[in-house]
């Protein structure tokens, strides 16, 4: 999609390649060189910029004086490095951890969901909440994968090179059921 100035934009945000699978990374590297990029997202929550997904840095910014105690409880309950779905925290027996989950849901997840899906959270399958976990770490990166980046010239040229193979025939406007045979 192009904006009013003719600039290509991603209406749903940039598509960033990320994997920890070396075989996948090496395979795709045959078709592109990479612009290494580590995606970090911040949200403006009540006038303060905080990392998303919510992590221990965000916890300290959001809860200030209570953060140290909450951090201890989170680490004791889930372990350092864990990724905890928001609903898990919202249903926790400990009231403070429940409060963390509710804070993330009300101040980050609701807005993320409406922007991402164009729907209210209650209209989305609850399993989707796992996509925006609370990270029990200080890693501000959006992805934890070893390999992250963007194809140097974009995804289209990378896929064009992949499809330019003697064993691949590209068929447009074709129903798969018309050409595939299931045995």
Model-derived regions, located:
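Dinucleotide-binding Rossmann-like beta1-alpha1 core, especially the glycine-rich loop
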Residues: 5-80
């Amino acid at each position: 999609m192009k904006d009013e100035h003719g600039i290509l934009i991603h209406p749903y945000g940039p598509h960033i390649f990320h994997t920890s699978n070396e075989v996948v990374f090496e395979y795709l590297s045959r078709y592109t060189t990479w612009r290494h990029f580590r995606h970090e997202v911040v949200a403006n929550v009540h006038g303060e910029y905080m990392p998303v997904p919510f992590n221990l840095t965000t916890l300290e910014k959001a809860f200030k004086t209570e953060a140290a105690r909450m951090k201890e409880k989170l680490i004791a309950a889930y372990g350092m490095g864990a990724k905890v779905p928001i609903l898990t925290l919202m249903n926790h027996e400990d009231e403070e951890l429940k409060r963390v989950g509710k804070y993330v849901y009300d101040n980050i997840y609701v807005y993320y969901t409406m922007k991402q899906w164009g729907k209210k959270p209650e209209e989305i399958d609850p399993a989707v909440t796992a996509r925006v976990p609370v990270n029990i770490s200080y890693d501000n990166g959006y992805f934890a994968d070893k390999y992250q980046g963007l194809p140097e010239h974009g995804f289209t040229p990378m896929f064009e090179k992949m499809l330019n193979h003697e064993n691949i025939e590209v068929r447009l406007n074709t129903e798969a059921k018309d050409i595939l045979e299931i045995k």
